[in-house]
A protein has these predicted regions:
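Active-site gating/metal-coordination segments in enzymes
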Residues: 90, 108-111, 116-195, 238-240, ...
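Glycine-rich anion/phosphate-binding loops
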Residues: 70-75, 95-105, 134-147
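Active-site gating loops and adjacent loop-to-helix segments of metal-dependent hydrolytic enzymes
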Residues: 27-71, 121-139
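N-terminal basic/disordered segments at the start of proteins
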Residues: 3-26
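Active-site beta-loop-alpha junctions enriched in small/polar residues
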Residues: 24-26, 96-97, 122-126, 165-168, ...
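Active-site core of metal-dependent hydrolases
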Residues: 191-249
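Catalytic domains of carbohydrate-active enzymes, especially glycoside hydrolases
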Residues: 78-92
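Divalent metal-binding segments
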Residues: 49-77, 94-99, 167-176, 201
């Protein structure tokens, strides 16, 4: 395969142009947060995002609901048109089930922005997993991803072009359900030769764990026979000053 599936169909790699490999277009993170009980914090949580609360948001991104949901389609189209006007060609949209993936909206955004948009398959951190993920086996989850990559997503003919960002949280390096998803994603990569990305646990860094947890993910990839030339680790900027770690990876 010398190209990639986009929300509007297959394109040759020569048509990609400048590409963002990790972006979110229509994102709903309600499954990951809870409204605070403290009255003052609740006021900030429910407020429209504005300059009066920006310092609070900088200290805690999830303190304001308006800050973590990207559901204003007109704004998304406007910003992607700006990206295209400055030379952008393609965006990999890593929205997933459980965090708002909406194939029809992404398709409309692609039409209106005239960008190539690659859509994803997989699941994010455990807290966001749809209930069925808990009950399905590794092979069953792999088959869902393979179907979305080869045949189409949710009964459409729109095919995923990337696996991920399959994400990890806690306990470090992964919740058991997240490991199941990653193992299934590895099997889907081997079966389809698709690109694959993992969101590493960022909790570990905050709690003082070494950033080398990502090496655990690479060990799993090797065990499952993943083509590492098709893999990229998301959020590597979190450890950008640890040169030795990046060299090892």
């Amino acid at each position: 395969m010398s190209g990639v599936e986009t929300v509007l169909g297959y394109i040759d790699k020569s048509e990609l142009g400048f590409t963002h490999s990790h972006e979110h277009i229509y994102l709903d993170l309600d499954s990951l947060i809870q409204a605070p009980k403290d009255p003052e914090k609740l006021k900030i949580y429910n407020a429209p995002f504005n300059m009066e609360i920006i310092s609070d948001v900088k200290n805690q991104l999830s303190i304001n609901k308006d800050n973590i949901d990207f559901v204003e389609v007109d704004t998304v189209i406007k910003e992607l048109r700006e990206f295209k006007s400055r030379g952008g060609g393609t965006v990999a949209c890593l929205d997933l089930p459980g965090i708002g993936r909406n194939i029809e909206i992404i398709k409309e955004v692609a039409i209106q922005s005239q960008l190539n948009i690659i859509v994803a398959t997989g699941w994010y951190i455990q807290k966001s997993h749809p209930e069925y993920v808990k009950h399905k086996s590794v092979d069953e989850l792999a088959e869902i991803m393979i179907t979305e990559l080869k045949d189409g997503i949710e009964g459409t003919n729109i095919k995923a072009g990337v696996i991920g960002e399959c994400a990890c949280s806690e306990p470090v390096p992964w919740h058991p359900e997240e490991k199941k998803v990653l193992t299934a994603a590895c099997k889907a990569q081997v079966a389809t030769d698709s690109a694959f990305t993992i969101h590493p646990s960022l909790v570990g860094k905050e709690l003082g764990h070494p950033p080398s947890i990502a090496e655990t993910y690479v060990d799993l990839l090797e065990k499952e026979g993943v083509d590492k030339n098709k893999f990229y680790l998301s959020h590597s900027d979190q450890t950008c000053f640890d040169k030795d770690y990046h060299v090892r990876l």
